[in-house]
Regions:
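Soluble catalytic domains of enzymes that build or remodel membrane lipids, polysaccharides, and related
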Residues: 1-211
């Protein structure tokens, strides 16, 4: 499967139009799934009224559906392979002040501590520390949001990004007990059309069943 953890656009849904053909070509055996990021809500645009803002968000959802993607808005799906199953959970953005927390994990998957292997799509990695590791047994969480602030320095095992001033978990794989978080640095840019060291990233993750 292919998953996308939000921020498909920066300000308005119209930004997606030139890329519809390319993104529609993404296919996977178990489907393409997405969630909304903070930029997808239109919170950074001075809309004429609330209706205009909501209409733009609706347009984004329609376009993603036309591309063959399934957006998970505080909901979940089960994926099967033989006798194995995985619960894929998608929540809306876990906002930081002054923006609201649209995400509702308990609504997306009420039985958060059952035995099913669970993958969570949550745009903001702060969500992992604030709710996921303390109140659930979700095995793997996938996030984005930080972009490593588009600046990363690395020398051997040492690395630095200004993103770590705000986000303790800003890039790569993290573990707490038996729970894992992967933060992808993304492929685009926000406001500044540049990346220094923080090269565009597409992550490939292989899950193996251990009997």
């Amino acid at each position: 499967m292919i998953v996308f953890t939000g921020d498909l656009v920066t300000l308005r849904s119209a930004e997606l139009e030139p890329f519809l053909h390319v993104l529609s070509g993404l296919k996977a055996k178990n489907g393409v799934y997405s969630i909304l990021g903070n930029h997808d809500y239109g919170d950074y645009v001075p809309w004429k009224n609330v209706s205009e803002k909501l209409e733009d968000r609706k347009h984004l959802r329609i376009r993603e559906k036309e591309m063959g993607w399934r957006m998970l808005n505080n909901e979940s799906v089960y994926l099967y392979s033989g006798n194995d199953s995985v619960a894929l959970i998608g929540v809306e953005n876990w906002g930081e002040p002054p923006f609201p927390k649209y995400g509702n994990l308990s609504a997306a998957y009420p039985d958060l501590n059952d035995d099913c292997f669970k993958i969570l799509l949550t745009h903001n990695p702060m969500h992992w520390d604030e709710e996921v590791i303390s109140g659930t047994n979700i095995d793997l969480s996938l996030s984005g949001h930080t972009h490593a602030m588009q600046i990363k320095l690395q020398l051997g095992n040492w690395r630095y990004s200004p993103a770590e001033i705000r986000y303790p978990r800003w890039s790569g794989l993290y573990r707490e007990g038996n729970q894992y978080l992967y933060v992808n640095e993304g492929i685009g840019c926000v406001f500044m059309p540049m990346r220094v060291g923080a090269t565009p990233e597409i992550t490939v993750i292989r899950l193996k069943c251990i009997s």
